[in-house]
Curated annotation (Swiss-Prot):
Region of interest (Coil 1A), residue spans: 106-137
Pfam families: Filament, Filament_head
Region called Linker 12, residue ranges: 250-266
Residue ranges with Polar residues bias: 1-13
List of glycosylated residues: T48, T433
Family membership noted in the UniProt record: Belongs to the intermediate filament family.
Domain IF rod: 102-413
Protein name, as recorded: Neurofilament medium polypeptide
Region (Linker 2): 289-292
Source organism of the structure: Sus scrofa (Pig)
Residue list for modification N-acetylserine: S2
Length: 455
């Protein structure tokens, strides 16, 4: 379908009117050629995004098919063809004046429709840019979900490591308790050995006292034996002297008897008798003294032997106790060293565990803060998207109003000249395809994705 020269007029004047209409539309609607395109949808800071959003608040998400433009052009052709038919059939100057007025109105509507088409083209371009931005946001949300899964995996690994460290700590604590029990048992044995040592030392002191007493008794007995031996020697020497004196006297008396022959025979026999009696008495005293001394010496020797046996056994017991005490002391020192080593290991493990736990908590807190910031950013984008949808709905209402106005003009012209002209063509309603997605659905999908990431 084409325009006639009568309806379109001069091409230069038509182009001038379209240009003026576009410039006036740019001044009225925010200059789509300059105002809209001068602002860019940036991914900067929240202040930059909000400012750019305020400047480009008229850029909603719209998807229109090319059928709408073809339908609009067909409706324009229909209006102009109706005006041509109207101008050719009506007689009179009033009708020409009304036709010129209607022609001017149609030209104004045509100019407005041209500006509207340009605005639609611009909105389609902005719609593509916004769709690309939404796709980028969805990819970012998917990357955040994957990052959340990675964080969850790392948190699970950290929790498993923490459980392993707690298990090792419990095992070390159990070993420490066992060592404490062993140390307590060794302390009890050490105290018992110390008591036995004290008892043994007390017995040794008592035996030493007995030994000292026995030594004193032995010294006294030795002194008595020595005195008795001296006395025996003195008595023996005295007896020998007396015997010698008596023998000398006997010899002297024997000589005298020899001289006197038979006068002194009785004296020699008496002396012999006296000598025999003295020797018998001396032998008896010597035998009794030796027997008493031997008995006493045997008793003292037996007592000393018994004391020596007791002392030797006591010394052996003391040496055995000393060896046991030394071995227990060495064992106690080794156990103390093991305890100190385990305590140091336990303190190191606790310190490392506390450090790892604090680092894990810091990491978890950092991840939670990042997740919270991501959710806030997503909520901010959803709010911006809601505002864009609101602007889009307002523009849809305005577009519907323009369409109703154009359809009303077409209907009025069609009803005016339906009887005279007849139907020239079948009018098709413009097809408009609007792809939109409600914010509630996006919020619901975001909640589902958050629940999946939390699980």
């Amino acid at each position: 379908m084409s325009y006639t020269l009568d309806s379109l007029g001069n091409p230069s004047s038509a182009y001038r009117r379209v240009t003026e209409t576009r410039s006036s539309f740019s001044r009225v609607s925010g200059s789509p050629s300059s105002g809209f395109r001068s602002q860019s949808w940036s991914r900067g800071s929240p202040s930059t995004v909000s400012s750019s959003y305020k400047r480009s608040a008229l850029a909603p998400r719209l998807t229109y098919s090319s059928a709408m433009l073809s339908s609009a052009e067909s409706s324009l052709d229909f209006s102009q063809s109706s005006s041509l038919l109207d101008g050719g059939s009506g007689p009179g100057g009033d009708y020409k004046l009304s036709r010129s007025n209607e022609k001017e109105q149609i030209q104004g509507l045509n100019d407005r429709f041209a500006g509207y088409i340009e605005k639609v083209h611009y909105l389609e371009q902005q719609n593509k840019e916004i769709e690309a931005e939404i796709q980028a946001l969805r990819q970012k949300q998917a990357s955040h979900a994957q990052l959340g899964d990675a964080y969850d995996q790392e948190i699970r690994e950290l929790r498993a490591t923490l459980e392993l460290v707690n298990h090792e700590k419990a095992q070390v604590q159990l070993d420490s308790d066992h060592l404490e029990e062993d140390i307590h048992r060794l302390k009890e044995r050490f105290e018992e050995e110390a008591r036995l040592r004290d008892d043994t030392e007390a017995a040794i002191r008592a035996l030493r006292k007995d030994i000292e007493e026995a030594s004193l008794v032995k010294v006294e007995l030795d002194k008595k034996v020595q005195s008795l031996q001296d006395e025996v020697a003195f008595l023996r020497s005295n007896h020998e002297e007396e015997v010698a004196d008596l023998l000398a006297q006997i010899q002297a008396s024997h000589i005298t008897v020899e001289r006197k022959d038979y006068l002194k025979t009785d004296i020699s026999s008496a002396l012999k008798e006296i000598r025999s009696q003295l020797e018998c008495h001396s032998d008896q005293n010597m035998a009794q003294a030796e027997e008493w001394f031997k008995c006493r010496y045997a008793k003292l020797t037996e007592a000393a032997q018994e004391n020596k046996e007791a002392i030797r056994s006591a010394k052996e017991e003391i040496a055995e106790y000393r060896r046991q005490l030394q071995s227990k002391s060495i064992e106690l020192e080794s156990v103390r060293g093991t305890k100190e080593s385990l305590e140091r290991q336990l303190s190191d493990i606790e310190e490392r565990h506390n450090h790892d736990l604090s680092s894990y908590q810091d990491t978890i807190q950092q991840l939670e803060n990042e997740l919270r910031g991501t959710k806030w950013e997503m909520a901010r984008h959803l709010r911006e998207y809601q505002d864009l949808l609101n602007v889009k709905m307002a523009l849809d209402i305005e577009i519907a109003a323009y369409r109703k106005l154009l359809e009303g003009e077409e209907t009025r012209f069609a009803s005016t000249f339906a009887g005279s002209i007849g139907p020239l063509y079948t009018h098709r309603q413009p097809s408009i395809t609007i792809s939109s997605k409600f914010v509630e659905e996006i919020i619901e999908e975001t909640k589902v994705e958050d629940e999946k990431s939390e699980m």
